[in-house]
Amino acid sequence: MDRRLHSLRGQAALINLWATWCPPCRAEMPAIQQVYERFRDQGFVVLAVNQQEDAARVVAYMNEQRLTFPALLDSDALVGAAYQVRVLPSSFFLDRRGLFALCIVDRCRVV
């Protein structure tokens, strides 16, 4: 994950830690998709980091919901532990310098 974050330097990014079994996670996914579609051509990146689920379940959910942003698997919850995530969903915004600009716990909303 750190290598991946390093590769994002120069781009604004949303890193969202989530799970398919989490109702607030499921509720915010359409808003995240909307933001991704609106800003991806401007270099905005979304990384949905799934916590402790298998690839088949995540792929099925992403396809069912027509989510097109990248999803990464954190099967052992190492990313969640590294960023001290205690509740899902948790979202982190990185600025173009690669610095954490904002952390949101609970739900993202489009404003």
Where does each model-flagged region fall?
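Conserved redox-active cysteine motifs that mediate thiol-disulfide chemistry
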Residues: 9, 17-34
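Nucleotide phosphate-binding site architecture
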Residues: 6, 23, 33, 52, ...
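Thiol/disulfide oxidoreductase modules built on the thioredoxin-like
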Residues: 60-68, 73-111
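Hydrophobic beta-strand anchors of alpha/beta hydrolase catalytic cores
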Residues: 14-15, 46, 91
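Structural microenvironment flanking redox-active thiols in thiol-disulfide oxidoreductases
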Residues: 26-65, 75-82
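Conserved hydrophobic/aromatic "anchor" residues
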Residues: 3, 8, 17-21, 61, ...
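A short beta-strand-turn-helix
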Residues: 1-13, 36-39
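Active-site acidic short loop of glycosyltransferases
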Residues: 9-11, 41, 67-68, 85
